[in-house]
């Protein structure tokens, strides 16, 4: 079933590396929103943000493409993609190490008029706590984005 709603996750993407299983999962709050919205039938789902240039970035990009998430406003920045190393203890995820978002923490996405026009095409624009987008919130508010 398709729902007449469009969503964009603007901000974080990471790879969760589960050390006890030697397996990696793409994620991040904004990536997860786009993927789950698509799974539940949203008509248009996008992710907008920065990726690094390493294998972790390639893993997230590949997974998003497989899920048919729109990536047209993403950019690659030379360097390490966001990651966290974690394990499970008694069924709970325990974080061991992370790189503070990789390139995203050092290169803040600076929204221009074209980015704001793109975001205005969506019914919902989502960002999260670890996105390093706080400086962009006044622009989003001024543009009256949903």
Regions found by a protein language model. Name each.
Residues 1-24:
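Positively charged, low-complexity intrinsically disordered leader regions
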Residues 15-20, 43-127:
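Conserved N-terminal subdomain of the carbohydrate kinase-like
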Residues 22-25, 61-63, 139-142:
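Short, glycine/charged-enriched secondary-structure capping and boundary segments
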Residues 24-28, 113:
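Short, conserved loop/turn and helix-capping segments at secondary-structure boundaries
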Residues 28-29, 56:
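Conserved alpha-helical elements of sugar-nucleotide-dependent glycosyltransferases
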Residues 29-39, 143-144:
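Histidine-anchored nucleotide/phosphate-binding helix
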Residues 124-146:
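Conserved beta-alpha-beta core of the PfkB/ribokinase-like small-molecule kinase fold
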């Amino acid at each position: 079933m398709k729902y007449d709603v469009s969503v964009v996750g603007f901000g974080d993407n990471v790879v969760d590396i589960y050390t006890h299983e030697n397996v990696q999962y793409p994620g991040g709050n904004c990536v997860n929103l786009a993927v789950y919205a698509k799974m539940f039938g949203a008509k248009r789902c996008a992710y907008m943000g920065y990726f690094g240039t390493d294998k972790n970035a390639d893993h997230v990009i590949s997974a998003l493409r497989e899920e048919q998430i729109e990536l047209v406003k993403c950019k690659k920045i030379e360097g390490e993609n966001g990651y966290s190393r974690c394990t499970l203890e008694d069924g709970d995820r325990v974080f061991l190490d992370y790189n503070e978002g990789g390139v995203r923490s050092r290169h803040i996405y600076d929204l221009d008029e074209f980015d704001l026009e793109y975001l205005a095409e969506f019914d919902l624009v989502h960002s999260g706590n670890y996105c390093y987008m706080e400086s962009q919130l006044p622009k989003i508010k001024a543009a009256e984005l949903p």
